[in-house]
């Protein structure tokens, strides 16, 4: 562990097109091998497609999708007396946003559409309607936490 304590959080710049920190975080999650301009093109293209299909502000659609994907609980491993228990814990708000974005991008990469722009746009639209693999992942996470509720007293 570092002696100086945790590294300070760096401030996130607002996205130049939509003026939203969420879009900046999404761009950073889509980013692969340092190709930021490509990641921006993918995200902006996906948000434009979402706007064309819904007719509403794409940032609002993205926020609705994230609200449907954000987990409230998760399980963490805790070793007690030689046994490892899956202990349900509440998820901090910043971590829930990060997990939601990670799941959105991860499951959009696994989709079958032709381009990444289409995949990301459709995953965002599905998530905003309460459908899609990323929403299912959240439900599975909540089910795991509910199933291991008996170990909640091991929380730290």
Curated annotation (Swiss-Prot):
MF terms in GO: mRNA binding; rRNA binding; structural constituent of ribosome; tRNA binding
GO cellular component: cytosol; cytosolic small ribosomal subunit; peptidoglycan-based cell wall; plasma membrane; ribosome
GO biological process, alphabetically ordered: ribosomal small subunit assembly; translation
Keyword Cell division: no
Record Pfam families: Ribosomal_S7 (PF00177)
Keywords: Ribonucleoprotein, Ribosomal protein, RNA-binding, rRNA-binding, tRNA-binding
InterPro entries, A to Z: Ribosomal_uS7, Ribosomal_uS7_bac/org-type, Ribosomal_uS7_CS, Ribosomal_uS7_dom, Ribosomal_uS7_dom_sf
Family as reported in the entry's similarity comment: Belongs to the universal ribosomal protein uS7 family.
Subunit and interaction comment: Part of the 30S ribosomal subunit. Contacts proteins S9 and S11.
PANTHER family linked: RIBOSOMAL PROTEIN S7
Record's function text: One of the primary rRNA binding proteins, it binds directly to 16S rRNA where it nucleates assembly of the head domain of the 30S subunit. Is located at the subunit interface close to the decoding center, probably blocks exit of the E-site tRNA.
Name the UniProt record assigns to this protein: Small ribosomal subunit protein uS7
Organism annotation: Mycobacterium tuberculosis (strain ATCC 25618 / H37Rv)
Gene: rpsG
């Amino acid at each position: 562990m570092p002696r100086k304590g945790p590294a300070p959080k760096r401030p996130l710049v607002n996205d130049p097109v939509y003026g939203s920190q969420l879009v900046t975080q999404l761009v950073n999650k889509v980013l692969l091998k340092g190709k930021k301009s490509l990641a921006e093109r993918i995200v902006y293209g996906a948000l434009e497609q979402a706007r064309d299909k819904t007719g509403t502000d794409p940032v609002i659609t993205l926020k609705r999708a994230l609200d449907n994907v954000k987990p409230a609980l998760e399980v963490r491993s805790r070793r007690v007396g030689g046994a490892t228990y899956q202990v349900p814990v509440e998820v901090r708000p910043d971590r829930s946003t990060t997990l939601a974005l990670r799941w959105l991008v991860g499951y959009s990469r696994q989709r079958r559409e032709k381009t990444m722009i289409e995949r990301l746009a459709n995953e965002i639209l599905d998530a905003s309607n309460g459908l899609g693999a990323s929403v299912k992942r959240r439900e599975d996470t909540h089910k795991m936490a509910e199933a291991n509720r008996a170990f909640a007293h091991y929380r730290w």
